[in-house]
Amino acid sequence: MTPKKGKKRVKKNIAAGIVHIASTFNNTQITITDVTGNVIAWSSAGARGFKGSRKSTPFAAQVAAGDAAAKAMEHGLKTVSVVVKGPGAGRESALRALSAAGLKITLIRDVTPIPHNGCRPPKRRRV
């Protein structure tokens, strides 16, 4: 068999970065970038092996955040500012997992889009 060809991950030496947490009702995605916006590491609940309704749990968000933080710390990341977006269940647990992984959080910003009476919302579920 031929050896697997692909890009080798280049070790960057980055001290500060931005963590983008996108938390929807169905999944939680964590993207870690440098201050200019170039992606260093990313993870999501689905990428960590959770399927279906388990992706939307706080534990899945915690696992995804820990994984993304570990990947980013390989590049020398130490301090981060956090940008949280969305109404999902994994917002707070992802933040706790980032600080537990050893990243120093300097700023937390909530950029959840709020409509000023925009589109009509989806109808209520009747179970």
UniProtKB/Swiss-Prot annotation:
SUPFAM superfamilies, sorted: Translational machinery components
GO cellular component: ribonucleoprotein complex; ribosome
Gene3D superfamilies: Ribosomal protein S11
Keywords per UniProt: Ribonucleoprotein, Ribosomal protein, RNA-binding, rRNA-binding
GO MF, one example: rRNA binding
GO BP of this protein: translation
Reported function: Located on the platform of the 30S subunit, it bridges several disparate RNA helices of the 16S rRNA. Forms part of the Shine-Dalgarno cleft in the 70S ribosome.
NCBIfam families on file: PRK05309.1, uS11_bact
Family listed: Belongs to the universal ribosomal protein uS11 family.
Subunit: Part of the 30S ribosomal subunit. Interacts with proteins S7 and S18. Binds to IF-3.
Protein name: Small ribosomal subunit protein uS11
Organism: Anaeromyxobacter dehalogenans (strain 2CP-C)
Species classification: Bacteria, Pseudomonadati, Myxococcota, Myxococcia, Myxococcales
